[in-house]
């Protein structure tokens, strides 16, 4: 068995490539507006994003309070690891906004 040579920031061509788009505080913590990761669920994609930004503790803290959209559909109270993603999907990362 060999280890994959794909880094967390490089999509794996055998798995769906998902664009993660950050808004407001999430964008500030990530240092970029968007980036692509591989995964078959929103949970896998978010785990890859966390790994890519593991040296920025604030990034994980912001993700912990965010809401998510996949393909313009709210993830809501679903566990992100149960939300399937497909190649070309956009996962929006939305921090809480002032006023609720």
Task: Mark where each language-model region is.
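Ubiquitin-like/PB1-type beta-grasp interaction modules and other compact soluble beta-rich domains
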Residues: 1-99
């Amino acid at each position: 068995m060999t280890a994959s040579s794909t880094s967390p920031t490089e999509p794996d061509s055998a798995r769906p490539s998902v664009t993660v788009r950050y808004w407001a505080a999430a964008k500030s913590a990530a240092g970029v507006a968007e980036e692509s990761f591989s995964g078959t669920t929103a949970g896998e994609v978010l785990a890859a994003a966390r790994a890519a930004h593991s040296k920025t503790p604030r990034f994980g803290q912001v993700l912990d309070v965010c809401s998510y959209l996949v393909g313009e559909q709210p993830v809501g109270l679903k566990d992100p690891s149960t939300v399937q993603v497909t190649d070309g999907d956009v996962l929006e990362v939305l921090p809480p906004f002032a006023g609720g």
